[in-house]
């Protein structure tokens, strides 16, 4: 497929995205995304964009339950790629909502390897917290053991939003029956100058306290995190309705 035809497909998707624009929402949301230039924000409410992602996914082979031998543009001639594949391979995207659409499409993929392949290609291009925090593909819940290797690779990345996504994945998938204190300790050991990494560390520890209080509490008692993340985790835990008043009172004594 030539570059002109690929561009036509991307422009068609952009036209449809702008048709979903809510200008008032754009003004509001731009204030929440200080590191994204306003001209890169279209202004589409999340439920509307998710619905569009579902419509776009219909008919694409990427959303089959089982990957075929030649599924994905990485393994077939470009002429054989469908429009969703062409969009997913048109990185980097310009608009913020294109990045969100990209993530929403990956989250719908039903084949583990396909979802993982596309996610790992996309992660280095994520440039904001909202895209990063969109969630994880549902199929990952069925493959937690093999996913862990990749999660730890993300934690070791030099890309802040890849690290944030790794921590978020541990928070979403590994705080209940699959919890291991090792995961919490490894998150606590992460050292970063990046605000959005440290905020996710705090969010993870606060959520871990809500679900695994006795196991996670020593991380704060022994001051295993940097001071900023330590105090922010306590703040977020004390804001949680899942933490008891008695626990909140004790946590306040652990501030540094």
Regions picked out by a protein language model, each given a short descriptive name:
Residues 1-256:
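Alpha-helical scaffold domains
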